[in-house]
């Protein structure tokens, strides 16, 4: 019985591996609503969706010099009414939720024309909204008619599959990206232009091509190397391109033939970053929290042991309850170190040292050994 069960388990893993490989590093030319239904449940780690915005443009836009503005007036962005758009939104979001892994997440980007309707659908379908992020465009298109504020931003909604999902968030990497400051939810990034903008005979290939810098931040924040990323509205292929560069696997669906071909050519020219340079900083929160007192309880460090600063000028004794005592103060390893330094706070794990096999080491070394054993 055990052997049969093992064989069945192995066979299931093989089937799962083959199914997942069917969607690795591929893009297809097809209707998203039809293609999503063909994908097995719980296939993807992350979804990035840039759906039609339903801009409702009834007239062409012109500049003050009467030249025509290259705006979004494509058929794929046109819907009969809000009801039809809502039905479309619910249909593709439902499929995306089904094919996300239980700890997966989704990003959806939009403008004021559609993002509030999309956000309602996201909540109604049981996703759990984590953040809304404002993409402030450094170089937005002006409001040529002067009838409204210049529309200088787009909104991204980031949501996990459910409230209980253990989604990926590379906090330390994003903090490092932002000069050691917490990454905020307003991102100042330029729109796509220059050499990055795909053109054919001098004309933009795609009217709403997203900048690679935006997807770089999204994928770095919420996915890991070798994760499988889905873009159900691939467009000119920015998501797949950045995923390939960052060592993520991608699967894209694009209905428009000319966009699909442009994305295909773009991916052929894209070179991945060397694997050695793709490691991300580990989150401190992912490490188990071990109080200093636990080292005392477990006998790793004994009451009465002397601990000292790096220069061995400050000495304190360890008490049975995990507190420490010094001439100037007593309390936790952090509190006593802060008092001695005259500061509001101090990381006692790195301030205090002890002697191990005749060598002075930070007491954090003892904690790290305990963590590695567990």
Cite the ranges covered by each PLM segment.
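Catalytic-site neighborhood detector that most strongly recognizes the C-terminal catalytic loop/helix
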Residues: 254, 266-269
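Short alpha-helix boundary/capping motifs
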Residues: 124, 150, 246, 270-272, ...
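Intrinsic-disorder/low-complexity peptide segments enriched for small residues
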Residues: 1-3, 11-17, 21, 55, ...
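S-adenosyl-L-methionine
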Residues: 20-35, 268-289
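Intrinsically disordered, charged low-complexity linkers and terminal tails
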Residues: 3, 245, 257, 262, ...
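Residue-level detector of short coil/turn "hinge" positions at structural boundaries
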Residues: 129, 250, 274, 344-345
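Acidic/polar loop patches that form or flank catalytic/metal-binding clefts of enzymes
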Residues: 167-169, 275, 347
